[in-house]
Amino acid sequence: SRLMDFMEKFVYPNEQKYYQHINKDKSRWSIPPIMEELKIKAKKENLWNLFLPESKYGAGLSNLEYAPLAEIMGRSFIASEIFNCSAPDTGNMEVLVRYGSDKQKEKWLAPLLEGTIRSAFAMTEPDVASSDATNIQSTIESRKNDYLVNGHKWWTSCAMDPRCKIIIFMGKTDAEAHKYAQQSMVLVPIDTKGVDVVRPLSVFGYDDAPHGHAE
């Protein structure tokens, strides 16, 4: 397949170049230039946004058709990003495609689809089992012209990436509602005043630079 050919010609041969870059202390939290070079090649080959079933934005593949391609990409740590198919961007783009306003799509979805920015999803919290959203303690308060967001998140994947510009943040908007209807999500630009990226956290001893799992 075209994807396998691309992997053989461009992805596997450049893995060492990627690791040589991030294994240097000075460049550890910067993006290896080879990634942007390979993303341009993947775009030209129309091997781009393969995960999105909507043909308007992606390749128009079903989950059944995409699954073996995801398996092939999974053979290399760097592959999914090269084809703009890496988490958490994939899930965040799907949310924006389905539920984003026209303005949100223009500002955030368009550059995500182009692969020029990255994004993060802030759900996990330090004091509760956050995979169950009913435990979330962060709050989102609707005010006249904006929202007041309060919370402490960690293991927010990709928030350390220098290209990360937007966070989808989960919090509670109505503590009096049914426990499965208390939660909402808001878009929070990472440069918003009050957003503090504290430190990278490790998983099994690895910090996953240059993307990271941030507190």
Across the structure, where does each feature detected by a protein language model lie?
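A structural signal for short hydrophobic beta-strand segments in well-ordered beta-sheet cores
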Residues: 138-141
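A generic structural signal for beta-strand entry/edge sites
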Residues: 144-148, 211-213
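A short core secondary-structure module
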Residues: 146, 150-198
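Amphipathic, small/basic residue-rich leader segments at the start of a protein or domain
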Residues: 1-87, 94, 98, 103-111, ...
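A short, Trp-centered hydrophobic/proline-enriched beta-strand micro-motif
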Residues: 115-124, 169
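Short, solvent-exposed loop/turn elements at beta->coil junctions and helix N-caps
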Residues: 55, 124-129, 155-157, 200-205
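Flexible, small-/acidic-enriched active-site or ligand-binding loops
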Residues: 135, 191-215
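Short glycine/proline-enriched turns and hinge-like loops at secondary-structure junctions
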Residues: 61-63, 131-134, 159-164, 178-182, ...
